[in-house]
Amino acid sequence: MGKKSGSSSSWLTAVKRAFRSPTKKEHNNNAHGNEVDEDEDKKKEKRRWLFRKSTNHDSPVKTSGVGKDAPAQKSTETTTIINPTVLSSVTEQRYDASTPPATVSAASETHPPSTTKELPNLTRRTYTAREDYAAVVIQTGFRGYLARRALRALKGLVKLQALVRGHNVRKQAKMTLRCMQALVRVQSRVLDQRKRLSHDGSRKSAFSDTQSVLESRYLQEISDRRSMSREGSSIAEDWDDRPHTIEEVKAMLQQRRDNALRRESNNSISQAFSHQVRRTRGSYSTGDEYEEERPKWLDRWMASKPWDKRASTDQRVPPVYKTVEIDTSQPYLTRGNSRTGASPSRSQRPSSPSRTSHHYQQHNFSSATPSPAKSRPIQIRSASPRIQRDDRSAYNYTSNTPSLRSNYSFTARSGYSVCTTTTTATNAALPNYMAITESAKARIRSQSAPRQRPSTPEKERISSARKRLSFPVPPLPQQMDGQSLRSPSFKSIGGSQLGALEQQSNYSSCCTESLGGGGEISPASTSDYRRWLR
Protein backbone atom coordinates (compact mmCIF):
# COMPACT_ATOMS: atom_id res chain seq x y z
CA MET A 1 0.00 0.00 0.00
CA GLY A 2 2.74 2.32 0.85
CA LYS A 3 4.41 1.62 -2.41
CA LYS A 4 1.33 2.32 -4.36
CA SER A 5 0.75 5.60 -2.62
CA GLY A 6 4.32 6.67 -3.23
CA SER A 7 4.18 5.75 -6.82
CA SER A 8 0.99 7.68 -7.35
CA SER A 9 2.36 10.84 -5.76
CA SER A 10 5.54 10.57 -7.72
CA TRP A 11 3.57 10.23 -10.92
CA LEU A 12 1.62 13.36 -10.14
CA THR A 13 4.69 15.38 -9.33
CA ALA A 14 6.46 14.08 -12.38
CA VAL A 15 3.62 15.21 -14.57
CA LYS A 16 3.68 18.65 -12.97
CA ARG A 17 7.40 19.04 -13.47
CA ALA A 18 7.21 17.78 -16.98
CA PHE A 19 4.49 20.32 -17.79
CA ARG A 20 6.13 23.32 -16.12
CA SER A 21 9.84 22.87 -16.58
CA PRO A 22 10.07 23.36 -20.33
CA THR A 23 7.88 26.47 -20.17
CA LYS A 24 10.20 28.05 -17.63
CA LYS A 25 13.29 27.26 -19.71
CA GLU A 26 11.75 28.66 -22.84
CA HIS A 27 10.78 31.76 -20.93
CA ASN A 28 14.32 32.30 -19.75
CA ASN A 29 15.88 31.52 -23.14
CA ASN A 30 13.56 33.55 -25.38
CA ALA A 31 13.47 36.57 -23.01
CA HIS A 32 9.83 36.79 -22.80
CA GLY A 33 9.35 36.21 -26.53
CA ASN A 34 6.67 33.61 -26.33
CA GLU A 35 4.14 35.07 -23.90
CA VAL A 36 1.20 33.83 -25.88
CA ASP A 37 2.39 30.23 -25.74
CA GLU A 38 2.98 30.54 -22.06
CA ASP A 39 -0.52 31.76 -21.47
CA GLU A 40 -1.90 28.83 -23.40
CA ASP A 41 0.25 26.43 -21.39
CA LYS A 42 -0.93 27.99 -18.17
CA LYS A 43 -4.49 27.56 -19.19
CA LYS A 44 -3.90 23.96 -20.03
CA GLU A 45 -2.08 23.47 -16.73
CA LYS A 46 -4.99 24.92 -14.83
CA ARG A 47 -7.38 22.67 -16.60
CA ARG A 48 -5.16 19.60 -15.92
CA TRP A 49 -4.57 20.60 -12.34
CA LEU A 50 -8.24 20.93 -11.73
CA PHE A 51 -8.83 17.55 -13.36
CA ARG A 52 -6.10 15.83 -11.34
CA LYS A 53 -7.08 17.59 -8.17
CA SER A 54 -10.47 15.95 -8.29
CA THR A 55 -8.82 12.57 -8.83
CA ASN A 56 -6.40 13.17 -6.02
CA HIS A 57 -9.19 13.87 -3.61
CA ASP A 58 -10.80 10.60 -4.61
CA SER A 59 -7.75 8.60 -3.50
CA PRO A 60 -7.76 8.09 0.25
CA VAL A 61 -4.10 7.14 0.50
CA LYS A 62 -1.66 9.76 1.69
CA THR A 63 2.03 9.80 1.06
CA SER A 64 4.54 10.04 3.82
CA GLY A 65 7.46 12.35 4.05
CA VAL A 66 9.86 9.87 2.59
CA GLY A 67 7.62 9.18 -0.26
CA LYS A 68 7.53 12.84 -1.05
CA ASP A 69 11.23 13.12 -1.27
CA ALA A 70 11.62 10.12 -3.48
CA PRO A 71 9.14 11.11 -6.16
CA ALA A 72 10.72 14.49 -6.27
CA GLN A 73 14.04 13.00 -7.08
CA LYS A 74 12.53 10.67 -9.65
CA SER A 75 10.74 13.50 -11.36
CA THR A 76 13.96 15.41 -11.69
CA GLU A 77 15.61 12.44 -13.23
CA THR A 78 12.89 11.90 -15.82
CA THR A 79 12.57 15.45 -17.02
CA THR A 80 14.93 14.91 -19.84
CA ILE A 81 12.95 12.02 -21.15
CA ILE A 82 9.52 13.53 -20.91
CA ASN A 83 10.51 16.95 -22.21
CA PRO A 84 10.16 16.20 -25.93
CA THR A 85 6.91 14.44 -25.49
CA VAL A 86 5.15 16.70 -23.01
CA LEU A 87 2.06 17.34 -24.99
CA SER A 88 1.57 13.77 -25.94
CA SER A 89 1.98 12.58 -22.41
CA VAL A 90 -0.41 15.20 -21.14
CA THR A 91 -3.05 14.21 -23.57
CA GLU A 92 -2.55 10.58 -22.85
CA GLN A 93 -2.79 11.12 -19.13
CA ARG A 94 -5.80 13.38 -19.58
CA TYR A 95 -7.82 10.96 -21.69
CA ASP A 96 -6.31 7.64 -20.46
CA ALA A 97 -6.51 7.41 -16.72
CA SER A 98 -6.08 3.62 -16.64
CA THR A 99 -2.33 3.58 -17.45
CA PRO A 100 -0.27 2.20 -14.59
CA PRO A 101 2.07 4.64 -12.90
CA ALA A 102 4.79 2.00 -12.52
CA THR A 103 6.21 2.65 -15.97
CA VAL A 104 6.59 6.32 -15.30
CA SER A 105 8.20 5.74 -11.97
CA ALA A 106 10.58 3.27 -13.51
CA ALA A 107 11.56 5.72 -16.17
CA SER A 108 12.13 8.35 -13.60
CA GLU A 109 14.33 6.10 -11.58
CA THR A 110 16.58 5.30 -14.52
CA HIS A 111 17.56 8.97 -15.20
CA PRO A 112 19.40 11.11 -12.62
CA PRO A 113 18.10 14.52 -11.29
CA SER A 114 19.14 17.57 -13.33
CA THR A 115 17.28 20.77 -12.24
CA THR A 116 16.12 20.94 -8.64
CA LYS A 117 16.46 24.71 -8.26
CA GLU A 118 13.52 25.61 -10.55
CA LEU A 119 10.72 24.35 -8.27
CA PRO A 120 9.82 27.64 -6.57
CA ASN A 121 9.48 29.39 -9.95
CA LEU A 122 6.73 27.05 -11.17
CA THR A 123 4.14 28.24 -8.59
CA ARG A 124 4.81 31.93 -9.17
CA ARG A 125 2.04 33.84 -10.83
CA THR A 126 2.99 35.23 -14.16
CA TYR A 127 0.40 37.93 -14.34
CA THR A 128 1.96 41.37 -14.60
CA ALA A 129 0.65 44.96 -14.34
CA ARG A 130 0.93 45.38 -18.10
CA GLU A 131 -1.49 42.59 -18.75
CA ASP A 132 -3.91 43.95 -16.18
CA TYR A 133 -3.71 47.43 -17.76
CA ALA A 134 -4.30 45.98 -21.20
CA ALA A 135 -7.34 44.08 -19.99
CA VAL A 136 -8.72 47.18 -18.27
CA VAL A 137 -8.20 49.27 -21.42
CA ILE A 138 -9.90 46.68 -23.57
CA GLN A 139 -12.83 46.37 -21.23
CA THR A 140 -13.13 50.16 -20.91
CA GLY A 141 -13.15 50.69 -24.65
CA PHE A 142 -15.68 47.98 -25.22
CA ARG A 143 -17.94 49.24 -22.48
CA GLY A 144 -17.62 52.81 -23.76
CA TYR A 145 -18.57 51.64 -27.23
CA LEU A 146 -21.66 49.91 -25.85
CA ALA A 147 -22.58 52.98 -23.80
CA ARG A 148 -22.17 55.30 -26.79
CA ARG A 149 -24.30 53.04 -28.96
CA ALA A 150 -27.00 52.89 -26.30
CA LEU A 151 -26.85 56.65 -25.84
CA ARG A 152 -27.12 57.21 -29.58
CA ALA A 153 -30.12 54.92 -29.78
CA LEU A 154 -31.68 56.63 -26.79
CA LYS A 155 -31.14 60.05 -28.34
CA GLY A 156 -32.75 58.95 -31.57
CA LEU A 157 -35.69 57.52 -29.71
CA VAL A 158 -36.09 60.68 -27.66
CA LYS A 159 -35.94 62.82 -30.78
CA LEU A 160 -38.54 60.68 -32.49
CA GLN A 161 -40.82 60.83 -29.47
CA ALA A 162 -40.36 64.59 -29.20
CA LEU A 163 -41.16 65.02 -32.89
CA VAL A 164 -44.30 62.92 -32.71
CA ARG A 165 -45.43 64.46 -29.47
CA GLY A 166 -44.69 67.97 -30.70
CA HIS A 167 -46.68 67.41 -33.88
CA ASN A 168 -49.57 66.05 -31.88
CA VAL A 169 -49.37 68.89 -29.40
CA ARG A 170 -49.31 71.50 -32.16
CA LYS A 171 -52.24 69.83 -33.90
CA GLN A 172 -54.21 69.75 -30.68
CA ALA A 173 -53.33 73.36 -29.94
CA LYS A 174 -54.49 74.43 -33.41
CA MET A 175 -57.76 72.58 -32.99
CA THR A 176 -58.29 74.17 -29.58
CA LEU A 177 -57.61 77.65 -30.94
CA ARG A 178 -60.01 77.10 -33.83
CA CYS A 179 -62.73 75.95 -31.48
CA MET A 180 -62.17 78.98 -29.26
CA GLN A 181 -62.28 81.30 -32.26
CA ALA A 182 -65.53 79.77 -33.50
CA LEU A 183 -67.02 80.08 -30.03
CA VAL A 184 -66.00 83.73 -29.81
CA ARG A 185 -67.53 84.42 -33.23
CA VAL A 186 -70.81 82.80 -32.24
CA GLN A 187 -70.91 84.77 -29.00
CA SER A 188 -70.22 88.04 -30.80
CA ARG A 189 -72.97 87.36 -33.35
CA VAL A 190 -75.46 86.51 -30.65
CA LEU A 191 -74.53 89.66 -28.74
CA ASP A 192 -74.92 91.84 -31.84
CA GLN A 193 -78.28 90.26 -32.63
CA ARG A 194 -79.48 90.85 -29.09
CA LYS A 195 -78.37 94.49 -29.21
CA ARG A 196 -80.11 94.97 -32.56
CA LEU A 197 -83.31 93.37 -31.34
CA SER A 198 -83.31 95.40 -28.14
CA HIS A 199 -82.72 98.62 -30.09
CA ASP A 200 -85.48 97.83 -32.57
CA GLY A 201 -87.82 96.84 -29.79
CA SER A 202 -87.16 100.03 -27.84
CA ARG A 203 -87.68 102.08 -30.98
CA LYS A 204 -90.90 100.32 -31.91
CA SER A 205 -92.24 100.26 -28.39
CA ALA A 206 -92.70 104.02 -28.43
CA PHE A 207 -95.13 103.66 -31.35
CA SER A 208 -96.82 100.45 -30.29
CA ASP A 209 -97.26 101.16 -26.59
CA THR A 210 -100.60 102.87 -26.97
CA GLN A 211 -102.00 100.20 -29.24
CA SER A 212 -100.71 97.43 -27.02
CA VAL A 213 -102.13 99.11 -23.95
CA LEU A 214 -105.51 99.46 -25.60
CA GLU A 215 -105.47 95.88 -26.78
CA SER A 216 -104.40 94.67 -23.37
CA ARG A 217 -107.14 96.68 -21.73
CA TYR A 218 -109.70 95.29 -24.18
CA LEU A 219 -108.54 91.75 -23.62
CA GLN A 220 -108.40 92.35 -19.89
CA GLU A 221 -111.98 93.59 -19.87
CA ILE A 222 -113.11 90.57 -21.86
CA SER A 223 -111.28 88.23 -19.51
CA ASP A 224 -112.72 90.05 -16.51
CA ARG A 225 -116.21 89.66 -17.88
CA ARG A 226 -115.64 86.00 -18.57
CA SER A 227 -114.13 85.46 -15.15
CA MET A 228 -117.02 87.26 -13.50
CA SER A 229 -119.51 85.15 -15.40
CA ARG A 230 -117.59 82.03 -14.53
CA GLU A 231 -117.38 83.04 -10.90
CA GLY A 232 -121.09 83.76 -10.74
CA SER A 233 -121.89 80.42 -12.28
CA SER A 234 -119.22 78.37 -10.56
CA ILE A 235 -119.90 79.41 -6.99
CA ALA A 236 -123.30 77.81 -6.87
CA GLU A 237 -122.23 74.87 -8.99
CA ASP A 238 -119.16 74.12 -6.89
CA TRP A 239 -121.12 74.63 -3.72
CA ASP A 240 -123.86 72.35 -4.92
CA ASP A 241 -121.68 69.68 -6.53
CA ARG A 242 -119.17 68.98 -3.83
CA PRO A 243 -118.71 70.20 -0.30
CA HIS A 244 -115.95 72.64 0.60
CA THR A 245 -114.35 73.34 3.89
CA ILE A 246 -114.25 76.78 5.40
CA GLU A 247 -110.54 77.12 4.67
CA GLU A 248 -111.04 76.31 0.98
CA VAL A 249 -113.87 78.81 0.69
CA LYS A 250 -111.77 81.49 2.37
CA ALA A 251 -108.86 80.71 0.09
CA MET A 252 -111.08 80.96 -2.99
CA LEU A 253 -112.51 84.28 -1.87
CA GLN A 254 -109.06 85.65 -1.04
CA GLN A 255 -107.77 84.59 -4.44
CA ARG A 256 -110.65 86.37 -6.15
CA ARG A 257 -109.97 89.52 -4.16
CA ASP A 258 -106.31 89.38 -5.08
CA ASN A 259 -107.17 88.93 -8.74
CA ALA A 260 -109.54 91.88 -8.62
CA LEU A 261 -106.92 94.08 -6.95
CA ARG A 262 -104.35 92.99 -9.48
CA ARG A 263 -106.67 93.82 -12.36
CA GLU A 264 -107.39 97.24 -10.90
CA SER A 265 -103.70 97.97 -10.44
CA ASN A 266 -102.97 96.86 -14.01
CA ASN A 267 -105.76 99.05 -15.35
CA SER A 268 -104.53 102.05 -13.38
CA ILE A 269 -100.98 101.51 -14.57
CA SER A 270 -102.07 101.16 -18.19
CA GLN A 271 -104.20 104.29 -17.96
CA ALA A 272 -101.35 106.27 -16.43
CA PHE A 273 -99.00 105.05 -19.10
CA SER A 274 -101.42 105.92 -21.89
CA HIS A 275 -101.86 109.41 -20.44
CA GLN A 276 -98.13 109.82 -20.25
CA VAL A 277 -97.69 108.70 -23.85
CA ARG A 278 -100.38 111.12 -24.99
CA ARG A 279 -98.75 113.90 -22.99
CA THR A 280 -95.35 113.22 -24.52
CA ARG A 281 -96.83 113.06 -27.99
CA GLY A 282 -98.67 116.29 -27.33
CA SER A 283 -95.41 117.99 -26.38
CA TYR A 284 -93.86 117.01 -29.71
CA SER A 285 -96.83 118.23 -31.73
CA THR A 286 -96.52 121.33 -33.95
CA GLY A 287 -98.85 124.15 -34.82
CA ASP A 288 -100.75 121.95 -37.24
CA GLU A 289 -102.14 119.91 -34.37
CA TYR A 290 -103.16 123.14 -32.69
CA GLU A 291 -104.94 124.08 -35.89
CA GLU A 292 -106.75 120.74 -35.83
CA GLU A 293 -107.98 121.33 -32.29
CA ARG A 294 -109.47 124.73 -33.04
CA PRO A 295 -112.36 123.53 -35.26
CA LYS A 296 -113.45 121.18 -32.50
CA TRP A 297 -113.50 124.02 -30.00
CA LEU A 298 -115.35 126.15 -32.54
CA ASP A 299 -117.90 123.41 -33.12
CA ARG A 300 -118.56 123.12 -29.42
CA TRP A 301 -118.90 126.87 -29.10
CA MET A 302 -121.20 127.09 -32.14
CA ALA A 303 -123.34 124.24 -30.88
CA SER A 304 -123.78 125.96 -27.53
CA LYS A 305 -125.17 129.12 -29.23
CA PRO A 306 -128.64 128.85 -30.81
CA TRP A 307 -128.86 130.82 -33.98
CA ASP A 308 -131.92 132.49 -35.42
CA LYS A 309 -132.68 132.83 -39.07
CA ARG A 310 -133.68 136.47 -38.79
CA ALA A 311 -131.56 139.58 -38.85
CA SER A 312 -132.39 140.52 -35.27
CA THR A 313 -130.55 137.47 -34.01
CA ASP A 314 -127.57 138.35 -36.18
CA GLN A 315 -127.49 141.89 -34.83
CA ARG A 316 -127.32 140.71 -31.24
CA VAL A 317 -124.05 138.92 -31.87
CA PRO A 318 -121.11 141.33 -31.86
CA PRO A 319 -119.46 141.11 -35.28
CA VAL A 320 -115.80 140.51 -35.50
CA TYR A 321 -115.39 141.66 -39.09
CA LYS A 322 -116.62 145.06 -40.25
CA THR A 323 -118.64 145.12 -43.45
CA VAL A 324 -118.30 148.01 -45.86
CA GLU A 325 -121.26 148.46 -48.20
CA ILE A 326 -120.95 150.82 -51.15
CA ASP A 327 -123.75 151.62 -53.56
CA THR A 328 -123.06 151.74 -57.26
CA SER A 329 -125.60 153.08 -59.68
CA GLN A 330 -126.36 151.92 -63.12
CA PRO A 331 -128.19 154.08 -65.70
CA TYR A 332 -130.83 151.50 -66.57
CA LEU A 333 -131.92 150.85 -62.98
CA THR A 334 -134.64 152.74 -61.11
CA ARG A 335 -134.73 153.52 -57.40
CA GLY A 336 -138.45 154.16 -57.02
CA ASN A 337 -139.61 150.59 -57.05
CA SER A 338 -136.83 149.18 -54.92
CA ARG A 339 -137.10 148.21 -51.36
CA THR A 340 -134.48 149.14 -48.91
CA GLY A 341 -133.37 146.18 -46.94
CA ALA A 342 -130.35 145.82 -44.81
CA SER A 343 -128.36 142.72 -45.27
CA PRO A 344 -126.61 142.35 -42.03
CA SER A 345 -125.22 138.95 -42.93
CA ARG A 346 -122.00 138.94 -41.08
CA SER A 347 -119.71 136.21 -40.04
CA GLN A 348 -120.29 135.30 -36.46
CA ARG A 349 -117.04 134.09 -35.04
CA PRO A 350 -115.94 133.67 -31.45
CA SER A 351 -113.25 135.81 -30.00
CA SER A 352 -110.25 133.66 -30.75
CA PRO A 353 -106.58 134.39 -31.38
CA SER A 354 -105.58 136.24 -34.49
CA ARG A 355 -104.09 133.10 -35.87
CA THR A 356 -107.43 131.32 -35.79
CA SER A 357 -109.25 134.19 -37.42
CA HIS A 358 -106.58 134.51 -40.05
CA HIS A 359 -106.79 130.80 -40.76
CA TYR A 360 -110.51 130.84 -41.37
CA GLN A 361 -111.18 134.31 -42.67
CA GLN A 362 -110.49 133.36 -46.28
CA HIS A 363 -113.56 131.10 -46.24
CA ASN A 364 -116.02 133.64 -44.85
CA PHE A 365 -117.66 136.02 -47.30
CA SER A 366 -121.02 137.62 -47.62
CA SER A 367 -123.03 137.22 -50.77
CA ALA A 368 -125.26 139.77 -52.38
CA THR A 369 -126.43 139.28 -55.96
CA PRO A 370 -128.81 141.45 -57.99
CA SER A 371 -132.12 140.22 -59.33
CA PRO A 372 -132.36 139.84 -63.07
CA ALA A 373 -135.96 141.03 -63.22
CA LYS A 374 -135.66 144.38 -61.43
CA SER A 375 -132.10 145.54 -61.27
CA ARG A 376 -131.30 147.69 -58.28
CA PRO A 377 -128.20 149.41 -57.04
CA ILE A 378 -125.67 146.69 -56.49
CA GLN A 379 -124.57 145.89 -52.99
CA ILE A 380 -120.82 145.43 -52.61
CA ARG A 381 -119.36 144.19 -49.37
CA SER A 382 -115.84 143.89 -48.22
CA ALA A 383 -114.83 142.33 -44.92
CA SER A 384 -111.56 143.09 -43.25
CA PRO A 385 -110.36 141.77 -39.88
CA ARG A 386 -108.01 144.70 -39.40
CA ILE A 387 -110.68 147.36 -39.00
CA GLN A 388 -111.24 148.27 -35.37
CA ARG A 389 -114.64 148.23 -33.73
CA ASP A 390 -114.73 151.97 -33.07
CA ASP A 391 -114.25 152.75 -36.78
CA ARG A 392 -117.38 150.88 -37.74
CA SER A 393 -119.42 153.98 -38.50
CA ALA A 394 -116.84 155.26 -40.95
CA TYR A 395 -117.07 152.18 -43.13
CA ASN A 396 -120.67 151.12 -42.72
CA TYR A 397 -122.77 151.82 -45.76
CA THR A 398 -126.19 150.54 -46.60
CA SER A 399 -127.42 149.55 -50.01
CA ASN A 400 -130.70 148.55 -51.46
CA THR A 401 -130.96 144.92 -52.39
CA PRO A 402 -133.42 144.39 -55.23
CA SER A 403 -136.04 141.73 -54.84
CA LEU A 404 -139.26 140.82 -56.63
CA ARG A 405 -140.92 139.78 -53.42
CA SER A 406 -140.41 140.51 -49.79
CA ASN A 407 -136.93 139.92 -48.45
CA TYR A 408 -136.42 136.46 -47.02
CA SER A 409 -133.46 134.78 -45.45
CA PHE A 410 -132.20 131.25 -45.81
CA THR A 411 -129.57 129.41 -43.88
CA ALA A 412 -126.55 128.30 -45.87
CA ARG A 413 -124.82 125.21 -44.61
CA SER A 414 -121.48 126.30 -45.87
CA GLY A 415 -119.62 129.05 -44.15
CA TYR A 416 -118.70 130.89 -47.33
CA SER A 417 -119.99 134.04 -48.88
CA VAL A 418 -119.07 136.14 -51.85
CA CYS A 419 -117.11 139.30 -51.42
CA THR A 420 -116.92 141.92 -54.16
CA THR A 421 -114.84 145.02 -53.92
CA THR A 422 -115.73 146.88 -57.14
CA THR A 423 -116.67 150.37 -56.01
CA THR A 424 -116.59 153.88 -57.46
CA ALA A 425 -116.51 155.73 -54.18
CA THR A 426 -113.65 158.12 -53.65
CA ASN A 427 -113.37 157.85 -49.95
CA ALA A 428 -109.99 158.91 -48.62
CA ALA A 429 -110.43 156.92 -45.41
CA LEU A 430 -110.30 153.56 -47.20
CA PRO A 431 -107.03 151.62 -46.88
CA ASN A 432 -104.76 150.80 -49.79
CA TYR A 433 -106.01 147.27 -50.25
CA MET A 434 -109.54 148.69 -50.74
CA ALA A 435 -108.50 150.83 -53.70
CA ILE A 436 -110.18 150.29 -57.05
CA THR A 437 -108.09 148.63 -59.70
CA GLU A 438 -108.08 149.20 -63.42
CA SER A 439 -110.01 146.01 -64.11
CA ALA A 440 -112.78 147.10 -61.74
CA LYS A 441 -113.01 150.52 -63.41
CA ALA A 442 -113.22 148.92 -66.84
CA ARG A 443 -115.91 146.57 -65.60
CA ILE A 444 -117.94 149.51 -64.23
CA ARG A 445 -117.63 151.37 -67.51
CA SER A 446 -118.78 148.32 -69.44
CA GLN A 447 -121.78 147.95 -67.15
CA SER A 448 -122.76 151.64 -67.33
CA ALA A 449 -123.04 151.77 -71.13
CA PRO A 450 -123.90 148.33 -72.41
CA ARG A 451 -125.10 149.49 -75.84
CA GLN A 452 -122.24 151.86 -76.65
CA ARG A 453 -119.25 149.81 -75.52
CA PRO A 454 -116.92 149.04 -78.39
CA SER A 455 -115.21 145.77 -78.97
CA THR A 456 -111.87 146.50 -77.41
CA PRO A 457 -109.20 144.25 -75.94
CA GLU A 458 -110.42 145.30 -72.51
CA LYS A 459 -113.64 143.39 -73.12
CA GLU A 460 -111.73 140.21 -73.79
CA ARG A 461 -109.61 140.81 -70.72
CA ILE A 462 -112.72 141.35 -68.60
CA SER A 463 -114.34 138.17 -69.89
CA SER A 464 -111.17 136.20 -69.24
CA ALA A 465 -110.92 137.67 -65.75
CA ARG A 466 -114.57 136.87 -65.20
CA LYS A 467 -113.98 133.26 -66.12
CA ARG A 468 -110.79 133.11 -64.10
CA LEU A 469 -112.28 134.53 -60.92
CA SER A 470 -115.36 132.33 -60.92
CA PHE A 471 -113.94 129.40 -58.96
CA PRO A 472 -115.59 126.88 -56.65
CA VAL A 473 -114.68 126.92 -52.98
CA PRO A 474 -114.48 123.65 -51.05
CA PRO A 475 -116.81 123.34 -48.07
CA LEU A 476 -115.84 123.46 -44.43
CA PRO A 477 -118.03 121.17 -42.35
CA GLN A 478 -117.08 122.98 -39.15
CA GLN A 479 -118.44 126.30 -40.30
CA MET A 480 -121.72 125.16 -41.86
CA ASP A 481 -123.96 125.73 -38.88
CA GLY A 482 -125.09 129.09 -37.69
CA GLN A 483 -124.56 131.14 -40.86
CA SER A 484 -127.53 133.19 -42.10
CA LEU A 485 -127.32 134.95 -45.42
CA ARG A 486 -129.82 137.30 -46.97
CA SER A 487 -129.94 137.06 -50.70
CA PRO A 488 -132.48 138.21 -53.28
CA SER A 489 -134.53 135.64 -55.08
CA PHE A 490 -134.08 134.77 -58.70
CA LYS A 491 -136.80 133.80 -61.03
CA SER A 492 -134.51 131.53 -62.94
CA ILE A 493 -133.33 129.59 -59.85
CA GLY A 494 -135.41 126.50 -59.29
CA GLY A 495 -136.84 125.33 -56.04
CA SER A 496 -134.52 122.38 -55.98
CA GLN A 497 -131.49 124.68 -56.07
CA LEU A 498 -132.91 126.83 -53.28
CA GLY A 499 -133.57 123.72 -51.21
CA ALA A 500 -130.03 122.56 -51.79
CA LEU A 501 -128.74 125.95 -50.69
CA GLU A 502 -130.90 125.81 -47.60
CA GLN A 503 -129.55 122.38 -46.68
CA GLN A 504 -125.92 122.60 -47.65
CA SER A 505 -124.29 124.84 -50.23
CA ASN A 506 -120.92 123.46 -51.13
CA TYR A 507 -119.91 126.19 -53.48
CA SER A 508 -120.08 129.94 -53.55
CA SER A 509 -118.81 132.09 -56.38
CA CYS A 510 -117.24 135.51 -56.20
CA CYS A 511 -119.16 136.74 -59.22
CA THR A 512 -122.69 135.76 -60.30
CA GLU A 513 -123.90 136.39 -63.78
CA SER A 514 -127.47 137.55 -64.26
CA LEU A 515 -129.57 135.38 -66.48
CA GLY A 516 -131.28 138.34 -68.08
CA GLY A 517 -128.14 140.21 -69.08
CA GLY A 518 -127.93 142.50 -66.05
CA GLY A 519 -124.90 143.82 -64.23
CA GLU A 520 -122.09 141.48 -63.21
CA ILE A 521 -120.05 141.71 -60.06
CA SER A 522 -116.67 140.04 -59.46
CA PRO A 523 -113.62 140.81 -57.37
CA ALA A 524 -110.82 142.74 -58.87
CA SER A 525 -108.22 140.05 -58.96
CA THR A 526 -106.74 137.28 -56.93
CA SER A 527 -103.90 139.55 -55.88
CA ASP A 528 -106.43 141.93 -54.30
CA TYR A 529 -107.91 139.02 -52.38
CA ARG A 530 -104.49 138.02 -51.18
CA ARG A 531 -103.65 141.54 -50.06
CA TRP A 532 -107.06 141.79 -48.40
CA LEU A 533 -106.61 138.50 -46.57
CA ARG A 534 -103.21 139.55 -45.31
Swiss-Prot record:
Q: Which PANTHER family match?
A: IQ-DOMAIN 5-RELATED, PROTEIN IQ-DOMAIN 17
Q: Name one GO cellular component term.
A: plasma membrane
Asked if Repeat is a keyword of the record, the answer is yes
- The answer to whether UniProt assigns keyword Cell membrane to this entry is yes
Question: What are the protein's GO molecular function terms?
Answer: calmodulin binding
Record's subcellular location: Cytoplasm, Cytoskeleton; Cell membrane
Describe the function of this protein.
May be involved in cooperative interactions with calmodulins or calmodulin-like proteins. Recruits calmodulin proteins to microtubules, thus being a potential scaffold in cellular signaling and trafficking. May associate with nucleic acids and regulate gene expression at the transcriptional or post-transcriptional level.
Q: Which InterPro entries match?
A: DUF4005, IQ_motif_EF-hand-BS
Tell me the disulfide pairings in this chain.
none
- The ranges of region (Disordered) come to 1-123, 259-290, 308-406, 441-495, 512-534
Quaternary data: Binds to multiple calmodulin (CaM) in the presence of Ca(2+) and CaM-like proteins.
Write down what this protein is called: Protein IQ-DOMAIN 17
Family note: Belongs to the IQD family.
Give the classification, highest ranks: Eukaryota, Viridiplantae, Streptophyta, Embryophyta, Tracheophyta
Species source reads Arabidopsis thaliana
Designated gene of the protein: IQD17
